[in-house]
Amino acid sequence: MAPSRKFFVGGNWKMNGRKQNLGELIGTLNAAKVPADTEVVCAPPTAYIDFARQKLDPKIAVAAQNCYKVTNGAFTGEISPGMIKDCGATWVVLGHSERRHVFGESDELIGQKVAHALAEGLGVIACIGEKLDEREAGITEKVVFEQTKVIADNVKDWSKVVLAYEPVWAIGTGKTATPQQAQEVHEKLRGWLKSNVSEAVAQSTRIIYGGSVTGATCKELASQPDVDGFLVGGASLKPEFVDIINAKQ
């Protein structure tokens, strides 16, 4: 990892937790040592964004797990970036594979959400990644480049974007991409940014890895030159998240 890229660890709590056990988790995180050279962001369920922001130490930022592409309107069940900011959160996760595959979100919709969230001043954790059949068919590159292009077409300022590579076959399955597999894709993604956006953006943009990251797997993954952090699912609800935050130490 280039020294200019601050290590980034996101915890995606997904649809988990209640105030009591999330409060306990927050207590653990508040007591934890967060290295000065590491940025930490937690993404609670929407109903708990306010709760998490009030309870979490200011050293840990808060993200929403999703948002819509417009400011207000007749969109029952949706939330806007403006609402997310009003609750004190500063980031949003967009394009997560569960949004793509469980809820049928298209590349186009995700691109529109990215553009609107950035325009409203949120940081965006933009997720991309291939399914198992796509990896086995040898089209990983094609899939992740196409997804990245739609995101890139909607970004004016890359300083507020973190790219999260999440091989779908490794999410919640216990299968982790090997450090070498992760590095290979991250390196290719950085190459794509260099060729299609700019050398400066390629060097400064953080590309993080997601997919069954645990306290046991994080150190070797973090040692790869193009792995700039993690987006952590299940393990972010456990005390081992503190170990992952300290993966570079």
Curated annotation (Swiss-Prot):
Stretch forming the signal peptide: none
Any one cellular-component term (Gene Ontology): cytosol
Protein name per Swiss-Prot or TrEMBL: Triosephosphate isomerase
Modified residues (N6-methyllysine): 194
Name of the gene encoding the protein in the UniProt record: TPI1
Listed HAMAP family: TIM_B
Biological function: Triosephosphate isomerase is an extremely efficient metabolic enzyme that catalyzes the interconversion between dihydroxyacetone phosphate (DHAP) and D-glyceraldehyde-3-phosphate (G3P) in glycolysis and gluconeogenesis.
Keyword terms, alphabetized: Acetylation, Cytoplasm, Gluconeogenesis, Glycolysis, Isomerase, Isopeptide bond, Lyase, Methylation, Nitration, Phosphoprotein, Ubl conjugation
CDD domains registered for this protein in UniProt: TIM
Active site as annotated: 96 (electrophile), 166 (proton acceptor)
Main location: cytoplasm
UniProt-annotated binding residues for substrate: 12, 14
Organism (species): Macaca mulatta (Rhesus macaque)
Compartments where located: Cytoplasm
